Structure formats: C-alpha cells, structure tokens
C-alpha cells in the first residue's frame, strides 16, 4: 500500500505532462485552423440556375478583387445557393414563387359547380350581420351566380341580404347580388341564387365573399371548417385564419360562410391535357435536377466560392437562405462587416471599401443602405404578405446592396431558428431589425432601381451582358455609366 502511495504522485505528474503536451498540440492546431479575418464578407444571393450571372461576377469585380492581393485579403465573396431544387415543375406548382404542388384531381368539367353546402346541424342563426370568407383560385374559373343559405323553406325567402365578391385589397366589389322577399332569385339545394355578370377569375386570384344582413336578425351561417366545400377537384381553396393568415384590412364582419357561389372551370380541356402530361413532365424535371446538382457541384469545386444552404431554392425561401448564410459566416469566418447583394446587381467594390473607411462606420449595431420608409404591404402577387398585420413595413434597406456590422450578423445567426420569415428577405430584415434598433446610415448610392449613376455603390436587375458592359466601361474610363468621347 505504501508503494502505491509513493507511485501516485509520479502517475499524476506523467498524466499532467501528457495533458500539457496534448493541450499545446490542440492549441497549435486551433491557431493553424483559425479563420482569416476579413474587413468585409460579401454574400451574393443566387438562384441555382443563374450560372451565367455568377460567371459574369467572377469575370468582373470578383476577378478584380482576386487580382489584387491587398483587396483579396480584405474581402471574402460567397454565392448563397439552396442545396435543393424544387422537385415540382413550375407548371405544376400553385405559384412560381414556392414549391407547393397544384393538387388538382378529377376536375368537374362542363357544368356549374356549387361551391358550398351546409349540413342542417352546422347551420345556425348568429348575431353577426356581416360574414365573410377568403379564397384563392388555383385554376381559372368563371363565377356564374352568388347565393345565400335558405332560412325558412315553408315561408319562402323573407330576408334582406346582400352578397358581394371582392378582389383582395380592392374596396369596390367585382359583382354583387341583392336578395329580398320581392326578389329572392332561384332556390337550388337549400341556397337562393342570383346570376351575376360573368368574367374569368385567373389563376392566383385572391377573393373575398361578403354576406351582409340588412335586417335586425343576424345571418344563417356556418363555421368554415364545418361547411362542405366543393372545390371542383382542387380548383380553389379557402384561406382561413386557422392557417395563420390575418384578415385583410378592409374586410368587415367575422369569418364564416352564409351562402355560396356557382362557377365553371375555364378551358377544362387544357387542364385535362396538363394533368395527363404531368407524370412525364415530372420525370423530365427530376432528371434535369440531377444534372443541375452535378453542374453545381462541379462549379463549386472549380471556383470554391459557393455556400450551399439547406433549403429548397425558391423565391419564398430567400429569407431562410440568408439566415442560413449568416449562421455559416459566424461559424466559419471572422469579419467586421457583411455586405449582402444579389447576383443580378452591379457592385463597385472599390467604392464600397473606400466609403467604409471614409464613413468610419461604427463596428457595432450598424446598418448602411438605402432605406425604404412606410412601404405598403402587398396582399397579392409575387410580394404577397399575408402574415404581417401592419399596413406598412418597418424601414428596410433595398436588397441590391447593404452592409451590416458583425454583431448584427451574430444576433441574426443566434436567433435564426426563432425568427419568422416573411415574403422577401429585404422586408424580413426590416422586421427583424425593428427588434434591436440598429444605427441606420442612409445612402442613396445603394440604388433601389435599375439605373446607372456615377459614384453608385450598387444597382440591381441587370442581365449578364449588361453587367459585363458596365464593368468594361468602368475599367476603360472609370465611369460604369458612360465613357466620354475624347
């Protein structure tokens, strides 16, 4: 036992010596692999198929950086690309901005379709005098009649009710029908209908049907989740509060259904042909995706300037692409500022670096860009925003180019799993930044629209050929917009 006690200090000493040796080796390894520190990391949002735009950047301002060692040591440029392409062809999606299948099956053709019916157990007289429901058209239809639920079949129609159909964000009804005891319309399957002027509601149309009682008594209506919806095989769908969507600003009353409308499917034969050719189209699309994946991997290996982020690469996922890139920068790089731009934008990187020095931007809580103020929220189209309640967005910088300090990137990266994404990355940034109140540096030289101005820092929406032309002009005469005749 005495010998064992004598040996213990020796064993501890050897172990401590080995620990010091291993720690010093680990520390040396950390120093070797410690990331290079940059003044600016540039993140270029790029769609998977935009090979030509990326190559133009590589042969213009990015090549200029790489040919000047002093600049290449200060600036790191990465293209941000989603790891996954959408596996649904554009023709078979609900809209071109997302990756959701247009799920139409067995459409009802060449006849009028009644949109809603209600079981007797689900229909109740409510205290509400105004009831509305929102819907989205997924394939073109023609509305033929508007209707209200039957109140008392024995006594005939004894109510005064107006039904109106609105296009979203429009205060004037597209068409309406007034029901009264003297003019009740035609009764079909428990609903009183009146014809309306017929015209085509296109794919993507966002509409609201509003029923209004002009009597002291409320409307006979049903909860949207208890009413039977006849969507013609997937031709339209309701957009309800349950899906997390907010009511449109002008909509009055409560959500519910107090009647219906009839409709026909427009150009049904074309729809049938589209559905019949879908399997072959999807097969060809998946084969094209495999080729695209291979080309992107080859491109990444060749140029070493792509960051693949784990999202499906669609317009609606651009905010998620950006948050994923912020996480990447924080984990694998060291920098003072981050510049975000798009692959169709001209960037005068020399001017940017010069202005960073001249402005003496604070290295904490700084956001330098060209800010849009009181920008109205769209409820339809490419920039449709259904989940932001306010009528206008907080101040946000135009997406063609802006710079944020490292600590803001750190905050975004740390909170990226909790931050809600909205319809665009620029407005999402404005909403996210409203929580921390950064110091905003307004500068109109980060152009918001496609135009060329001497001294500009960025300008958006160029074709590859146009980007090459303005860069060549800048190289020849120092002005990207024009070279003066000498």
Swiss-Prot record:
Function (record text): Beta-1,3-N-acetylgalactosaminyltransferase that synthesizes a unique carbohydrate structure, GalNAc-beta-1-3GlcNAc, on N- and O-glycans. Has no galactose nor galactosaminyl transferase activity toward any acceptor substrate. Involved in alpha-dystroglycan (dag1) glycosylation.
GO BP of this protein: protein glycosylation; protein O-linked glycosylation
Annotated TM spans: 11-31
Matches recorded under PANTHER family: BETA-1,3-N-ACETYLGLUCOSAMINYLTRANSFERASE, UDP-GALNAC:BETA-1,3-N-ACETYLGALACTOSAMINYLTRANSFERASE 2
Annotated Pfam families: Galactosyl_T (PF01762)
Catalytic activity from the UniProt record: 3-O-(N-acetyl-beta-D-glucosaminyl-(1->4)-alpha-D-mannosyl)-L-threonyl-[protein] + UDP-N-acetyl-alpha-D-galactosamine = 3-O-[beta-D-GalNAc-(1->3)-beta-D-GlcNAc-(1->4)-alpha-D-Man]-L-Thr-[protein] + UDP + H(+)
Family of this protein: Belongs to the glycosyltransferase 31 family.
Main location class: Golgi
UniProt membrane topology term: Single-pass type II membrane protein
One cellular component (GO) term of this entry: Golgi membrane
Recorded metabolic or biological pathway in which this protein acts: Protein modification; protein glycosylation
Lumenal topology ranges: 32-486
Topological domain spans for side Cytoplasmic: 1-10
InterPro entries the record matches: Glyco_trans_31 (IPR002659)
Keywords assigned: Endoplasmic reticulum, Glycoprotein, Glycosyltransferase, Golgi apparatus, Membrane, Signal-anchor, Transferase, Transmembrane, Transmembrane helix
Glycosylation sites: 103, 160
Protein name: UDP-GalNAc:beta-1,3-N-acetylgalactosaminyltransferase 2
One Gene Ontology molecular-function label: UDP-glycosyltransferase activity
Top-level taxonomic group: Eukaryota
Cell location: Golgi apparatus membrane; Endoplasmic reticulum
């Amino acid at each position: 036992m005495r010998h064992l006690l004598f040996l213990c200090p020796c064993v501890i000493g050897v172990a401590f010596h080995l620990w010091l040796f291993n720690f010093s080796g680990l520390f040396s390894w950390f120093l070797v692999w410690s990331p290079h520190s940059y003044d600016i990391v540039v993140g270029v949002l790029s769609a998977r198929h935009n090979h030509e735009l990326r190559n133009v950047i590589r042969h213009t301002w990015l090549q200029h950086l790489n040919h000047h060692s002093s600049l290449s040591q200060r600036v790191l440029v990465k293209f941000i690309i989603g790891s996954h392409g959408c596996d649904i062809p554009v023709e078979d999606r609900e809209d071109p901005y997302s990756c959701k299948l247009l799920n139409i099956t067995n459409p009802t053709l060449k006849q009028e379709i009644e949109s809603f019916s209600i079981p007797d157990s689900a229909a109740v007289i409510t205290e509400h005098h105004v009831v509305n429901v929102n819907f989205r058209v997924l394939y073109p239809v023609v509305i033929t009649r508007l209707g209200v639920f039957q109140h008392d079949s024995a006594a005939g129609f004894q109510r005064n009710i107006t039904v109106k159909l609105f296009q979203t964000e429009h205060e004037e009804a597209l068409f309406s029908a007034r029901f009264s005891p003297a003019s009740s319309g035609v009764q079909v399957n428990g609903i009183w209908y009146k014809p309306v002027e017929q015209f085509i509601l296109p794919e993507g149309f966002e509409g609201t049907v509003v029923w209004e009682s002009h009597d002291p008594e409320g409307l006979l209506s049903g909860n949207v989740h208890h009413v039977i919806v006849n969507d013609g095989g997937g031709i339209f769908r309701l957009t309800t509060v349950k899906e997390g969507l907010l009511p449109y600003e002008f909509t009055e009353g409560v959500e519910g259904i107090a009647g219906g409308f009839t409709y026909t499917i427009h150009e049904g034969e074309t729809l049938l042909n589209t559905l019949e050719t879908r399997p072959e189209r999807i097969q060809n699309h998946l084969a094209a995706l495999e080729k695209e994946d291979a080309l992107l991997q080859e491109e990444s290996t060749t140029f070493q300037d792509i960051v693949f982020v784990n999202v499906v690469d669609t317009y609606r996922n651009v905010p998620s692409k950006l948050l994923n890139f912020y996480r990447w920068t924080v984990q694998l790089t060291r920098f003072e500022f981050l510049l975000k731009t798009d692959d169709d934008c001209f960037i005068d990187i020399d001017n940017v670096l010069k202005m960073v020095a001249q402005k003496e931007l604070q290295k904490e809580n700084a956001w330098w860009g060209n800010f849009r103020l009181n920008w109205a929220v769209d409820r339809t189209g490419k920039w449709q925003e259904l989940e932001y309640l306010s009528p206008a967005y907080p101040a946000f910088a135009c997406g063609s180019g802006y710079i944020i300090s490292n600590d803001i990137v750190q905050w975004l990266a740390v909170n990226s799993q909790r931050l809600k994404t909205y319809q665009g990355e620029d407005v999402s940034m404005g909403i996210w930044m409203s929580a921390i109140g950064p110091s905003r540096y307004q500068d109109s030289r980060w152009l918001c629209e496609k135009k060329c101005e001497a001294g500009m820092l960025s300008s958006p929406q160029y074709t590859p050929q146009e980007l090459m032309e303005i860069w060549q002009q800048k190289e020849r005469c120092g002005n990207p917009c024009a070279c003066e005749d000498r």
